[in-house]
């Protein structure tokens, strides 16, 4: 197997710096920052805190701790299925109502569902973790709900940014991942 570049022209510095030019577009920067913060809470914080909280409270071994993360997988898969399909349906329905392609901002209404699920999921996780004395699955049900909300927000906000600047879609993906990864690294320190 050989890795090579599809385009025969050599890499240039401009190609590496081009995603940084997206900082000039609020329609890319604002959703990226909003998504990165939610990602920091729903993915990074939960994966760091579950072992820290469950080990002393329930005396779990590494396998039992690892099984708690299945809730993130389940929530993410469900959130993607709901978020992607509903987002496309929502925009298609609006297209039929007004007889033309709706503005990309119309899609942002769906992110409220995701934000609500994140808050509800965190409330369930925190309250149930505090109240139970012997383990039951209710705290990780909250984690799954928050993960579903995270994925709905991901789908909605990234698709919105791409809808606003279709010609920059590849760079938007790089930009979102750069900001998200940077925020995910910084997040656990505060």
Locations of regions flagged by a protein language model:
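Short acidic/histidine-centered micro-motifs embedded in hydrophobic/aromatic stretches
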Residues: 25, 35-36, 175
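Structural motif
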Residues: 26-27, 58
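Hydrophobic alpha-helix/TM-entry signal in multi-pass membrane transporters
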Residues: 14, 27-32, 111, 139
């Amino acid at each position: 197997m050989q890795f090579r570049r599809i385009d025969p022209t050599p890499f240039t510095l401009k190609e590496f710096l081009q995603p940084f030019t997206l900082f000039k577009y609020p329609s890319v920067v604002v959703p990226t920052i909003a998504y990165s913060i939610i990602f920091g809470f729903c993915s990074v914080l939960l994966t760091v805190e579950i072992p820290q909280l469950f080990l002393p409270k329930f005396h779990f071994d590494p396998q039992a701790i690892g099984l708690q993360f299945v809730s993130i997988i389940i929530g993410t898969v469900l959130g993607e299925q709901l978020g992607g399909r509903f987002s496309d349906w929502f925009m298609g329905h609006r297209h039929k109502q007004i007889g033309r392609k709706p503005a990309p901002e119309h899609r942002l209404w769906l992110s409220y569902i995701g934000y609500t699920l994140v808050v509800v999921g965190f409330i369930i996780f925190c309250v149930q973790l505090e109240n139970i004395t012997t383990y039951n699955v209710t705290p990780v049900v909250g984690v799954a709900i928050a993960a579903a909300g995270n994925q709905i927000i991901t789908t909605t906000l990234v698709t919105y940014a791409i809808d606003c600047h279709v010609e920059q879609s590849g760079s938007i993906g790089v930009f979102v991942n750069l900001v998200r990864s940077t925020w995910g690294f910084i997040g656990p320190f505060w």
